[in-house]
């Protein structure tokens, strides 16, 4: 990683590095880390599963005609094996009620962001109190839609 240089100083004085290079990931199947992903790909396996277990009722959406709105006609799914309800909220300083109300995607994002710092060799002690930003993205509005259908079940 090359250090950033302040503009106007002719490159004489290096300042703090501006990038941390690390990686974390979650993919379907057994790929819960970059090395797991590589192992899966290098052995010619995929994360496809014929059964989603109790996390997704495929039969409820299956229809032999692919043009039926809201239905699909696939025989399998790519799904994380990790249960998204399992989350160490205390580790992240989040109380139990707030953790239950969080979108599972956000919980996974916190875990993966932490693992990315670990992969980069950056400890939390080194980050604490620093002027550090983390940029990541993801979008899935389905959790909000589920909560709006049953607001009485919102854990508050």
For the regions a language model picked out, list residue spans one by one.
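Serine/threonine-rich low-complexity intrinsically disordered regions
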Residues: 83, 123, 138-142
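Generic beta-strand/beta-sheet core signal
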Residues: 21, 135-139, 144
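Structural signature of cysteine-dependent C-C bond-forming condensing enzymes
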Residues: 3-8, 119-133, 145-156
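ACP-dependent fatty acid/polyketide chain-elongation machinery
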Residues: 2-101, 106, 110, 114-118, ...
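A glycine-rich phosphate-binding loop feature that marks nucleotide/adenosyl-phosphate handling sites
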Residues: 54-62, 128-139
């Amino acid at each position: 990683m090359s250090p950033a240089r302040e503009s106007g100083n002719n490159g004489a004085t290096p300042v703090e590095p501006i990038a941390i290079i690390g990686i974390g990931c979650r993919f379907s199947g057994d790929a819960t880390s970059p090395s797991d992903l590589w192992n899966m790909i290098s052995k010619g396996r995929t994360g496809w599963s014929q059964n989603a277990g109790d996390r997704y009722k495929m039969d409820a959406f299956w229809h032999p005609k692919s043009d039926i709105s809201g239905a699909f006609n696939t025989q399998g799914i790519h799904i994380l094996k990790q249960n998204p309800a399992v989350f160490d909220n205390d580790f992240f300083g989040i109380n139990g009620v707030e953790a239950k109300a969080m979108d599972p995607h956000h919980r996974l994002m916190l875990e993966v962001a932490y693992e990315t710092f670990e992969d980069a060799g950056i400890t939390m002690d080194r980050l604490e109190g620093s002027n550090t930003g983390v940029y990541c993205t993801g979008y899935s509005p389905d959790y909000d839609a589920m909560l709006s259908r049953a607001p009485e079940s919102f854990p508050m």
